[in-house]
Amino acid sequence: MNSAEPDRSQHDNAPRMRGWVSFWNSENSIYVNARHRDVHFRAIADDLRAYVPGPQASVLDYGCGDALHADRVADVIFRLILSDAAPAVRERLRQRFASHAKIEVRAPEEVEAIADATLDLVIFNSVAQYLSGDELDRLLAVFLRLLKPGGRLVLGDVVPPAHSTVAAITALLRFAAHNGFLLAALAGLVRTAFSDYRRLRTQLGLTLYEEGAMIAKLEAAGFSAHRARTNIGHNPARMTFVAERR
């Protein structure tokens, strides 16, 4: 397999995106408890700091989710733009970081109004699986336009076709054991089996990528790309790619 494919048959993309945005815009059980949610976002923020090019960098985190520890990234750069498609998420971000001078929150359509070639780094973590290939191509064109020459896109947590449910569960339980919420994680796995996330994943599907297919997609969009040695976040079976604007 050398191309992107959904884990089910092709879906109508507009309802698919509306379904996923609605899920993230509402209360959900994707995190088993507050501890899980906190350490999840802290781990991501700490991983992202390694990609920061320097203290004068302007950075966009697109599809950032609740980004509880975005301040850890903002503290080592000049400017951090947080963007998410879910209005409720954006409102929480605005409230959480209202007093942080380096952080601003924008809707996706506001991101597209940013001046060309003004960003040093774009972060796009754990989002590609919710988009069709065409939708990802459109966003890659936006990111290419916004990045300075030599600027980088970090596309993280990409799900490969060979990624199994067992591998995902194992990664979660290891992360939970290391961070003190193992019992809650075990109970959460039972809830997830009957959750809206499982229902939506069955109905709408996820888009999966082989390593070579993602590199080819990034290079076709105008980037020089390679797979990073480690993935962002807790799941080592997923993939992170680093793409530099040519």
Per-segment meaning from a language model:
Residues 1-52, 66-101, 107-113, 154-246:
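Class I (Rossmann-like) S-adenosyl-L-methionine-dependent methyltransferase catalytic domain
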Residues 56-65:
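Conserved class I S-adenosyl-L-methionine
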Residues 57, 78, 120:
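Conserved acidic residues
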Residues 123:
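A conserved beta-strand element that flanks and buttresses the S-adenosyl-L-methionine
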Residues 126-127:
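Short catalytic micro-motifs in class I SAM-dependent methyltransferases
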Residues 132-133:
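Helix-capping/helix-break motifs at membrane-protein junctions
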Residues 137-149:
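A short glycine-rich, Lys/Arg-flanked "PGG" loop and its adjoining helix->strand segment in the class I
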